[in-house]
Amino acid sequence: MKNYVITIMDNEKSVEAAKRCILSGRAHGLEIEHFPACTPENTNIQKAFVERGIPEEGFVEKYSRLENCMAAFLSHYSCWEIASKENTEVTVFEHDAYLVGPIPDPLFYYGCVNLGAPSYGKWLQPSWIGVGPL
């Protein structure tokens, strides 16, 4: 089993958040490693999509930044490729993920699953206005 946190390696805030994710995993017995994110700056996104036979059409929508959206998907897809090529389970965490408990072992599910406890609007309201920490 491999556990990755997708990290924009040249973005300090992404790296800091990913380190928190790694430490939170370690606190619950899960070793997580950085997975360098695909970005428009470090990857030819269109070429990567063509090589993998991924159609761009589903990524075009009014409000998204197309290349960023495609790059984020490609980061996840790259982790899935590892799972397929190495015939192993892979857990993929966003850089701002934070584990508050152990991940069930074994999961008894093979495929794609979302593990989380969304706040559903019950998050802590920040006491300031403006940019804050991740």
Task: Locate each region found by the language model.
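An acidic/histidine-cluster motif and surrounding catalytic segment
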Residues: 1-93, 97-134
